[in-house]
């Protein structure tokens, strides 16, 4: 609701500041190749299941390279506009024992809660997810305070029949594979 119905002040980035970061010829070529009702074309109808499977697996290399590309452009945006975007951003006490992990519109509210609680001496923090897919466990663990004892993951989706919602499962897997089984992990949902 907040992202679709709320009126909020925003800072608009000047196109001139960002245009040098984008190859507009590549954008035009991409758009020319996109599906268009004025120039209809069929795609994907010429593969059997075995070939389709191979093509889906071949895409993995592109997905694996994506985080480095995103970080490169985040650094350019940060330098140009004075922002501080990373794959994951941490906000809160350096020695936090309780941390929220979330993405999207809830982060603004969570920051206010973190400010309120840290002012009262509580050791709390927030990990903001900026790039969700592909999930980069190493980058997540890098920003998670070493002092954390409890993590609450806030999802904004419902996966019927699943053991947990997507962000929760990614955090759970990351903590488990890093040997951080002693951290108490809780999942929650703040909307759909």
Tell me the role of every PLM-derived stretch.
Residues 1-90:
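Conformationally flexible catalytic loops at phosphate/diphosphate-handling active centers
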Residues 2-12, 111-113, 138-139, 162-166:
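Short acidic, glycine/serine/threonine-rich loops at helix termini
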Residues 66-85, 102-110, 129-137:
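A general structural motif
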Residues 91-94, 143-145, 178-179:
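Solvent-exposed alpha-helices and their adjacent loops that cap or buttress functional pockets
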Residues 94-122, 135-142:
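Redox- and metal-dependent alpha/beta enzyme cores, enriched for Fe-S-associated oxidoreductases
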Residues 128-133, 187-191:
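Short beta->alpha junction loops
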Residues 150-192:
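Peripheral docking tails and interdomain loops at the edges
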